[in-house]
Amino acid sequence: MKFVDEATIKVKAGDGGNGCVSFRREKFVPFGGPDGGDGGDGGSVYLVATHDLNTLADFRFQRHYEAQRGENGSGRNMTGASGADLEVPVPVGTLAYDAETEELIGDLVEHGQRLLVAQGGFHGLGNTRYKTSTNRAPRQSKPGTPGELRVLRLELKLLADVGLLGLPNAGKSTLITQVSGARPKIADYPFTTLYPGLGVVRVGPLQSFVMADIPGLIEGAAEGAGLGIQFLKHLSRTRLLLHLVDVAPADPAEDPVAAVHTIEAELQQFSEDLASRPRWLVLNKIDLIAPDERESFTKELVARLGWEGPVYAISAATGEACESLMQAIMKYLEEAQSHDADTATAG
């Protein structure tokens, strides 16, 4: 079972600056010697691992990265400035392959780790370098070399940040489709996986997270019939659970409160660790409740449940309030990550 996010990007290092052909020209110095300076080195391209990213979603919007070229040399033996290196942030855990040869260039496993993926071009030489005892006025110089051009395939094992709970008719797959398909603010992203209930949600530049449906909780999951060990491992870093409830079931006899209790009991039996994660109540299909009745309906349902955590009312089908829910999730995940970082520093 593979949960893999992939992206293909093109990286181009900066070309080296050219050397200069120049001669010293001053009053009373009729035969000034060569004074052409060297060019500057081209900038290189590095991938830099960061905990601030969870997915490769941003590479859907920018696929080409180019470092600065070196400046040309000039007279008076002035050397051209070197081009600035370009650092491309990627999530920790990213594997970088050469797309043409499939050679593994590197595995970025630590925050702050840098991986050289395209070497900058070397500087050219000015004509000063070619002065000899027999050639006092060389008109020869050397151009800079081109920077390396490479197509990379980036691969990242996806781990779910947010898990979805709920009965089969609660609208989990509809929500994943809605939030990973509403462009441009929350963009769909083609990733390869054998598991369909997984979505990369892009909230904004450098802001994305992975949402996963937790399947089969009702069908004997506590006895191991539903989730396998691999999928449990996949959910190991889930920071937040969204508990989806169908507030307008097709069968009026179905009680949303009973549906919540059913899932809670099964979850507790299935995994105490997962059951202890923070959980938000998401009331789905709110569009089927009359607008003037929604507030009282929500209050009554929350009171019957004795629910004290966050509550959101949405419509996965129409997209109503979905974006604000995704923004709230992103904020929560960023704050949790920041808290973890502070704790690690203090420890």
UniProtKB/Swiss-Prot annotation:
GO molecular function annotations of the record: GTP binding; GTPase activity; magnesium ion binding
Binding site for Mg(2+): S173, T193
Principal location: cytoplasm
Annotated ranges, domain OBG-type G: 160-334
Top-level taxon in the UniProt lineage: Bacteria
Enzymatic class: hydrolase
EC numbers, comma separated: 3.6.5.-
InterPro entries reported in the protein's UniProt record: G_OBG, GTP-bd, GTP-bd_Obg/CgtA, GTP1-OBG_CS, GTP1_OBG_dom, GTP1_OBG_dom_sf, OBG_GTPase, P-loop_NTPase
Cell compartments where the protein resides: Cytoplasm
Protein residues bound to GTP: 166-173, 191-195, 213-216, 284-287, 315-317
GTP-binding in keyword set: yes
UniProt keyword annotation of GTP-binding present: yes
Ranges of compositional bias, category Polar residues: 129-138
GO CC term (a single one): cytoplasm
Ranges of residues in domain Obg: 1-159
Alphabetical UniProt keywords: Cytoplasm, GTP-binding, Hydrolase, Magnesium, Metal-binding, Nucleotide-binding
Function: An essential GTPase which binds GTP, GDP and possibly (p)ppGpp with moderate affinity, with high nucleotide exchange rates and a fairly low GTP hydrolysis rate. Plays a role in control of the cell cycle, stress response, ribosome biogenesis and in those bacteria that undergo differentiation, in morphogenesis control.
Cross-referenced HAMAP family: GTPase_Obg (MF_01454)
Family: Belongs to the TRAFAC class OBG-HflX-like GTPase superfamily. OBG GTPase family.
Quaternary data: Monomer.
Protein name: GTPase Obg
